[in-house]
Amino acid sequence: MLENGSLFFYMDLSKCRGLDSTFMGMLVDIHKKYRARNGCLWVSNPTANARKQLTTLGVTEIVDVRDYEKPEGFEFEEISVNAADFDSGSWLRFVKKSHENLVSIDHKNRKRFNMFLQNLQTEMQERNIQCNREEKQ
């Protein structure tokens, strides 16, 4: 979307049954990319459980999360991120970056994800996967 010149990204979570930390870290990444271009990410209509998860990890402190209708003039495009769409190196880099994003927004997330990130780093080193290469998405 951002590559197409759109400065607004609206994500409706009303049909989302659950969130994992990688997804929430991806939201932080999308937010940062849009903010860098004076754009905006809106996340709307999360379930009570999803809202609690977003709040617990600090995502609601930086991402606009609320209940509201789709803004007029917006067109929806269904998107999905699936591990099968990535080679193993790209997927591991994506997961790592997502969790680093969560750590960057709330110091409590370092404790939550430190061991996971260390294990991920070890796995990447064992598989000789470059940690800083940009993933192709």
What are the residue ranges of the model-derived segments?
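STAS-like cytosolic regulatory interaction modules
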Residues: 1-15, 32-137
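A broad, low-specificity signal for short, low-complexity segments enriched in glycine/proline
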Residues: 2-4, 22-25
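Ligand/cofactor pocket segment of small-molecule handling proteins
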Residues: 14-24
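Histidine-anchored nucleotide/phosphate-binding helix
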Residues: 27-31
